[in-house]
Amino acid sequence: MTTNVTQLAATLASLAALLAEQQPAPEPEPEPAARRLPNRVLLTVEEAAKQLGLGRTKTYALVASGEIESVRIGRLRRIPRTAIDDYAARLIAQQSAA
């Protein structure tokens, strides 16, 4: 029985030494950074919706109602970056006035 205990103690000691020598596991790669919006003057409706935190359908409805200014370039609909800021400022003013 003493030899079994001695062998077990020796095995545990060698395992402890191996664990002490082992390098820590590498940290996982960080999540890729969220894509930033392009630094353009005119944004697509989808880009404007993302910046406002709204859905595409709601943003199209705001454009159709005139609440968000937009321009047409051929068949394309674009929203000036300033129109997004103006819309947000109007919302804040309405909320603070109420």
From Swiss-Prot:
Molecular-function annotations in GO: DNA binding
Ranges of the DNA-binding region feature: 42-63
Keyword terms: DNA-binding, Plasmid
A Pfam short name: HTH_17
Record keyword Oxidoreductase present: no
Annotated family: To the xis proteins of bacteriophages and of plasmid pSAM2 from S.ambofaciens.
Function: Possibly a non-classical excisionase.
Name under which the protein is recorded: Probable excisionase
Organismal lineage: Bacteria, Bacillati, Actinomycetota, Actinomycetes, Pseudonocardiales
